[in-house]
From Swiss-Prot:
Belongs to the importin alpha family. InterPro entries: ARM-like (IPR011989), ARM-type_fold (IPR016024), Arm_3 (IPR032413), Armadillo (IPR000225), Importin-a_IBB (IPR002652), Importin-a_IBB_sf (IPR036975), Importin_alpha (IPR024931). Induction: In both etiolated and green leaves, down-regulated by light. In green leaf, increased by dark treatment. ARM repeats lie at residues 105-145, 148-187, 190-230, 232-271, 274-313, 316-356, 359-398, 402-441. Forms a complex with importin subunit beta-1. The whole complex, most stable and composed of importin alpha, importin beta and NLS substrate, is referred to as PTAC or pore targeting complex. Interacts with mungbean yellow mosaic virus capsid protein. Residues 1-58 form the IBB domain. Highly expressed in callus, followed by root and etiolated leaf. Low expression in green leaf. The lineage of its organism: Eukaryota, Viridiplantae, Streptophyta, Embryophyta, Tracheophyta. PANTHER family: IMPORTIN ALPHA (PTHR23316). It comes from Oryza sativa subsp. japonica. GO terms for molecular function: nuclear import signal receptor activity; nuclear localization sequence binding. Pfam families: Arm, Arm_3, IBB. This is Importin subunit alpha-1a.
């Protein structure tokens, strides 16, 4: 449904803020998912292959030759796996595990083709022989770390429910390897993730996360938990909600890996409707998330910021929770420090959702000293950051009071908003036009109150070369932008421009013309 320009400001605020089945809310989250994909190194890996203890050593040039030699002994290894002798079974399974653990290009396909996967799955059930269970689980973990087809082989042989059962094993090593395997399966795709969850993996996984858990298990279990929460379409929130209390504890860890994966899990769980956001808030995570906005490692800071940003897409009360925990000074530091582009972009996005709130929330942003640095980014930053800063300023003009909007102008927002009117992004042009229109309304009110004949802000826009740009937008291909430009010119410049423009007819799309002559300036459609 297309909206008249006059309707867009309020609809944009409501949709962008509440984000319930909202076009704008979805746009933000989709953009951010692209950002996640682009910065995969900042996020945990979808799958992890467990390498051997010697993996830290340099790989000799002859490594490939060694693999070929081992593949030559495959028939003997297969024989050992299928023998009835426990020692031969363990020795052969360990050889396969080592083969699958080499650092570069492990021969996963060749191992699958050798037909040993169903036997490894059988070995998972050998409670009498935990060492064999462990080696088989490790081998299957590494097979599942491969392609989706490789993972499917592990699933199709019935390994998932057995791995879930192994989360209750008396062997620490077996439990940890089962956690890792389930993380690899869940990380393959939303379909595989849902299969793992449907097999009841979440609660026994959460049981691994207690004060006695060793660090390697803590890291693996938190990573697997993040894979359980990740992906689009999202898992059922009722299935993943039980993870919230554990995540609320994990974000107090001192370990960077645990912190990173716990914050990513929270970012996935908070990405959605207000009921999800409320559940995340009620888990008590907000104070710690705000603290983590100042974490020295970007790998922790980015998912913490993403989660805070998701929370402020909620309603005003949910946004206030973040403000009350002193997030604004942290966001200010993210804008002003020499941090990477993606962090500044996310910080501006977060602020734009706060300025889409009520007047008190806009005032909190002003009081935090954020507007000046925001305007500076709007003027000087890369385009991706400018776009988010434009939303933040425009939202503030939409919901701000008369005095708040005058403050935005005093901080220099007019010139950079005018400069963006020639950018190629249609949505940003519209956002800037809306911001300028809201500023002009305040100037008009001031003009009336002072019984004067000059709208000071229209003069400032003219001096910033904004008037010329708005006039040029009358020939824009996008009808919505054309209509908005005409509306602004008609409301704020027509009287002043009558003499200079005379009866000039400005070309307009779709057969419309706009005449600034004596006829009063109605658009005529022919």
């Amino acid at each position: 449904m297309s909206l008249r320009p006059s309707e867009r400001v309020e609809v944009r605020r409501n949709r962008y803020k509440v984000a319930v089945d909202a076009e704008e809310g979805r746009r933000r989250r989709e953009d951010n998912m692209v950002e996640i994909r682009k910065s995969r190194r900042e996020e945990s890996l979808l799958k992890k292959r467990r390498e051997g203890l010697q993996a830290q050593a340099p790989v000799p040039a002859s490594a490939a030759t060694g693999v070929d030699k081992k593949l030559e002994s495959l028939p003997a290894m297969i024989g050992g796996v299928y023998s009835d002798d426990n020692n031969l079974q363990l020795e052969a399974t360990t050889q396969f595990r080592k083969l699958l653990s080499i650092e570069r290009s492990p021969p996963i396909e060749e191992v699958i083709q050798s037909g040993v996967v169903p036997r490894f799955v059988q070995f998972l059930t050998r409670e009498d022989f935990p060492q064999l269970q462990f080696e088989a689980a490790w081998a299957l973990t590494n097979i599942a770390s491969g392609t989706s087809e490789n993972t499917k082989v592990v699933i199709d042989h019935g390994a998932v429910p057995i791995f879930v059962k192994l989360l209750g094993s008396s062997s620490d090593d077996v439990r940890e390897q089962a956690v890792w395997a389930l993380g690899n399966v869940a990380g393959d795709s939303p379909k595989c993730r849902d299969l793992v969850l449907a097999n009841g993996a979440l609660l026994p996984l959460l049981a691994q996360l207690n004060e006695h858990t060793k660090l390697s298990m803590l890291r693996n279990a938190t990573w697997t938990l993040s894979n359980f929460c990740r992906g689009k379409p999202q898992p059922s929130f009722e299935q993943t909600r039980p993870a919230l209390p554990a995540l609320a504890r994990l974000i107090h860890s001192n370990d960077e890996e645990v912190l990173t994966d716990a914050c990513w899990a929270l970012s996935y769980l908070s990405d959605g409707t207000n009921d999800k956001i409320q559940a995340v808030i009620e888990a008590g995570v907000c104070p710690r998330l705000v603290e983590l906005l100042l974490h020295p490692s970007p790998s922790v800071l980015i998912p913490a910021l993403r989660t805070v940003g998701n929370i402020v897409t909620g309603d005003d009360a949910q946004t206030q929770c973040i403000i009350d925990h002193q997030a604004l000074p942290c966001l200010l530091s993210l804008l002003t420090q020499n941090l990477k582009k993606s962090i500044k972009k996310e910080a501006c996005w977060t602020i734009s959702n706060i300025t889409a709130g009520n007047k008190d929330q806009i005032q909190a942003v002003i009081n935090a000293g954020i507007i000046g640095p925001l305007v500076n980014l709007l003027q000087t930053a890369e385009f991706d950051i400018k776009k988010e800063a434009a939303w933040a300023i425009s939202n503030a003009t939409s919901g701000g009071s008369h005095d708040q909007i005058k403050y935005l102008v005093s901080e220099g927002c007019i010139k950079p908003l005018c400069d963006l009117l020639i950018c190629p992004d249609i949505r940003i042009v519209t956002v800037c036009l809306e911001g300028l229109e809201n500023i002009l309304k305040v100037g008009e009110t001031d003009k009336t109150l002072a019984a004067g004949d000059v709208n000071v802000f229209s003069q400032m826009i003219d001096e910033a070369e904004g008037l010329e740009k708005i006039e040029n937008l009358q020939s824009h291909d996008n009808n919505e932008i054309y209509e908005k430009a005409v509306k602004i010119l008609e409301a704020y410049w027509m009287d002043e421009e009558d003499d200079t423009m005379g009866a000039t007819t400005v070309a307009a799309p779709q057969g419309a013309t706009f005449d600034f002559g004596q006829g009063g300036g109605a658009a005529q459609f022919k």
